[in-house]
Amino acid sequence: MIPARRRLLTVLAGVSLSAFAPPAPPSYSIDAIRYATVPQFPLRALVMGAPESEKLDIAMVVWLIRGSGKVILFDTGFHREKWMKQFTVTDYVRPDEALRAAGVPPETVTDVVISHAHWDHMGGIDLFPQATVWIQKDEFAYYTGAAWQPGGRHGGIDPEDVAALVRLNTEGRVRLIDGDDVEILPTIRVYTGARHTFASQYVRVDGEAPVVLASDNCYLYRNLEARAASATFTPEDRDANLRAQERMIALAGHRDRVVPGHDPLQFARYPAAGRVARIR
């Protein structure tokens, strides 16, 4: 009788403790989706110190993060014709249609995280009608204001994209992130300091094997391997970019878990089918 009673008490104690146990953190899958290619892009524009003659077909990519009822897109690509002509874009599929082809209707995207305001990263924010848009507060403020004043810098920024961002803000769909190392969604954190644009950010997706999605804060694996800066907001920001790359490696726990912004090798290093590579 006593052993049976003890067993019952043990079971009841376990049930009681489990009621107060914290919920398990969300587990996200991560996919890279290639929606276009820019052929024969000068490597020197991507990797400081690269030979002038070297060129690369760069991948145009958005990243899909899914789990716990969330469908999150990191960067949105672009769809304006002028940029296709300027950069001789090939193999193009509009980003929302690239998602649909991967089995994800664009209207199911719950959140969009913008790394920075350049045309090929923020240019598709109007393609995902139900999504909340996350962007750094300082990036929003600069590119809707001082960037267009005398002495401002707005290279690579499309005024139509800025207008779309402002409109979404007036509709209550924009969330402004205030600074570095902020958890915007459970186990998804953003970090600043790489200075690709005025206040560019990158994402860490936590888990047993954390992944850092660098976007243009680190263009290629070659940046990491050669410890070479990506393009920065001003030339004086190069050291900040290198420090950020080191931080990305530390945050990911290994250099191989840092995913660069435009490297076609991510579709060779990870299992891939068509336009989609499974990062995790």
Residues of each region from the PLM?
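Active-site glycine- and acidic-residue-rich loops that bind
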Residues: 189-201
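Cap/insert and terminal regions of metallo-dependent hydrolase folds
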Residues: 89-92, 200-280
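Active-site metal-binding loops of divalent metal-dependent hydrolases
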Residues: 35-36, 76-79, 117, 138-139, ...
